[in-house]
From Swiss-Prot:
Pfam families: DUF179
Database matches in SUPFAM superfamilies: VC0467-like
Entry-linked InterPro entries: AlgH-like
CC annotations in GO: cytosol
Biological classification of the source: Bacteria, Pseudomonadati, Pseudomonadota, Betaproteobacteria, Burkholderiales
Protein name (record): UPF0301 protein Rfer_1377
Family in the record: Belongs to the UPF0301 (AlgH) family.
Lineage top rank: taxon: Bacteria
Native source organism of the sequence: Albidiferax ferrireducens (strain ATCC BAA-621 / DSM 15236 / T118) (Rhodoferax ferrireducens)
């Protein structure tokens, strides 16, 4: 692994699938990278809805859904790993303003850049009663790469990378997220060649 790894850390970035990436889950996907280190990477696909919405998910976990604004929001297929497990990407919620590294939820990854990913049920319980984070993306499963794997895929032109924008995650309609992520790079879909290669 190169010594300048810190310069290429993709935590809090989007991975945007190139047209040549033909995979059922990752084709035309946008992945939010929650963690990237020398050991590998972990992320959530933010533009592939499952066949259930938040209201149905909350019924399955036997919680009321008091947030009308979230009832019809889709649950996403976050990736192929642990697809039976829920991952909640949300704005940071701190227990103590003096300790911004500590979340109010039991099992939370604090992501540099202002978001958190929580896997404990307490975040769903908070949402169910109208408390908790206002902006959330709930996914089943996650995407993972082993040591050097993501870097290899990027060098093979499978992915474009760009600093993440929370508006694309939480405010952009699902069908427009891929194109909006490309626009962060000043690109449009027609500009991308399906044939990978280096000039």
């Amino acid at each position: 692994m190169p010594a300048d790894f810190a310069l290429t850390n993709l935590t809090n970035h989007f991975l945007i699938a190139m047209p040549g990436l033909q995979d059922e889950i990752f084709s035309r996907s946008v992945v939010y990278v929650c963690e990237h280190s020398q050991r590998g990477a972990l992320g959530l696909v933010i533009n592939k809805p499952c066949d259930i919405d938040m209201k149905r998910l909350f019924e399955k976990v036997e919680l009321p859904m008091c947030r009308a604004d979230l009832s019809n929001t889709p649950v996403f297929l976050g990736g192929p790993v642990q697809t039976e497990r829920g991952f909640v990407l949300h704005e940071a919620t701190f227990a103590d303003a003096d300790k911004p590294a500590e979340s109010v939820y039991a099992s939370t990854m604090v992501i540099p850049g202002g978001l958190e990913m929580t896997t404990s049920k307490d975040v769903l319980e908070a949402i169910s009663i109208g408390a908790g984070p206002r902006k959330v993306l709930v996914s089943l499963g996650y995407a993972a790469w082993g040591e050097g794997q993501l870097e290899s895929e990027i060098s093979e032109n499978s992915w474009l990378t760009v600093a993440a924008n929370n508006s694309v995650i939480f405010d952009t309609p699902v069908a427009q997220r891929y194109e909006q992520a490309l626009l962060l790079l000043g690109l449009e879909l027609w500009m991308l060649s399906p044939d990978a290669g280096h000039a």
